[in-house]
């Protein structure tokens, strides 16, 4: 189930994004970005609709998925 990021309390959203950034370990190119810069980049992805907050009812977990990686038909998640 997709959760509108605007409906999430600001502190909770910040923590969710921070966890996502730490877990992803994404390569940001030759220039190293600060943790806060990476958080701002993910916020921009959410605002632009290029990422979404997803709740799995099956696993009772919340995650951020990029639009490119999101697959509502995945069999190991209960996305709607």
UniProtKB/Swiss-Prot annotation:
Coiled coil: none annotated. This is UPF0270 protein VSAL_I0295. Disulfide bonds: none annotated. It comes from Aliivibrio salmonicida (strain LFI1238). Belongs to the UPF0270 family. The lineage of its organism: Bacteria, Pseudomonadati, Pseudomonadota, Gammaproteobacteria, Vibrionales. InterPro entries: UPF0270, YehU-like_sf.
